[in-house]
Every structure is written in structure tokens, then in C-alpha cells.
Amino acid sequence: MASLSGPISPTNLEMFKPGVEELNPSKLLLLSNHQEGMLYPTILGSLELLSFKRERSLNLLRDKVCLLHQESQLLKLRGTGTDTTDVLLKHAMATSVNCCHDGIFTILEQDRMPKTSMAPTLTESSGSLVTRLMSIPRLTFSIGTQVAMRLFRLGFRLARYSLRVTILKAQEGLLLIPDLLHAHPVEPLVQDRVVEPILAIEPLPLV
């Protein structure tokens, strides 16, 4: 901000009076903005505060114009079925450059945002994936059987009773599978599978 040099004369004091009707053009300093070629007046004296308020209100008006312009772009892109995130980000940066001629930019360069796909990616073919999914119950049952046999050998009565009830219910479900498939049709994947014969399991001891 420029300052007055030399002794203060009565002529200079007239600038600080509130009843100034006309501003002398010789007392204005024109600062050029090299980016946009715009001129901003820097007023000497107490009228500098009024000029600052006027420029600030102008900047707020520009911000409102930018926001309305972005909202209109969002309404145009609504319902098109495309991802509007990158479009709005690029448009917001371009609009801020056009609107904020004399602003201070805190973000010099926008980093590229990594695009993540929410859809699951299958690295296996459908046949091998189905085979792997079908082998999961067998592995689970085999592990459960081994754990049950260990608990029976250790002699925990309550654990043995609970496991016996669970195993009996599982055997009952296996016996009812053929009848349930005919009564309640399910997915073709299950219908095409041949029900394996159930091997006779020796009765488990209660004690």
C-alpha cells in the first residue's frame, strides 16, 4: 500500500473528510493484472477500506456465479448413466480459474484420483470356481468330524452330547435330501448333482 510522503498539508487532509463528492483521478494507482489484463484501483487515504469492501463483494458474487454454473452442469449430467465425478472436478477447476482472477490458489495441481471398481473381479473360470465352492462343505465336514472324534476320546460329557445331537441332525438332513429335491425344485446346479450314497456310520457312544 502506498503512503503519503512529506508533511501533511490541509489539501491532503481533505481526503480524509467523509463528505468527499468526487475522487481525483491523479490520486489513484492502477495496478495491472498480467494474467487477465484487468485493472484494480488502489485508493489512497480512508477510501481504501471502501474499495476493499467493494472488491470483496465482487469476489463473493463471482463465487456465487461459479456455484450456480456447477449446479447447472450437474443437472445436465443427471440421468445420463455416466460417472460425473471426474467431469465435475475438472469443470470446477476450470471455472475457479475463470472466476477467481485475483485469488490465491492453495492447490496448484490436482493429483489424479485412482479409479476403483466396485465390481468383483473373478480370476478363475466359472467351472473351477463352482468346483472350489462345492469342495468347501466337504472340507468343513471332515474337520468337524475330526474335532468331534477328539472330543469323544477326551471324555467331555456335555461336549459329546452336543456333538451327537448335531451329527444326528446332519445325518437326518442327508437322508432327506433326495425327497426334498423332488418336492422343492432348486437351482439347476444342485439338481444336476448326483446325490452321493451315504456311508453307514457306526453309532457314537453316549458315555
Curated annotation (Swiss-Prot):
Its main location: virion. Signal peptide: none annotated. The keyword Magnesium does not apply. Keywords: Virion. The gene is N. Belongs to the coronavirus I protein family. CDD domains: embe-CoV_Protein-I_like (cd21662). It is found in: Virion. It comes from Bovine coronavirus (strain F15) (BCoV). Structural protein that is not essential for the viral replication either in tissue culture or in its natural host. InterPro entries: Corona_nucI (IPR004876), N2-like_embe-CoV (IPR044311). The keyword Cytoplasm does not apply. This is Protein I. The gene encoding this protein is included within the N gene (alternative ORF).
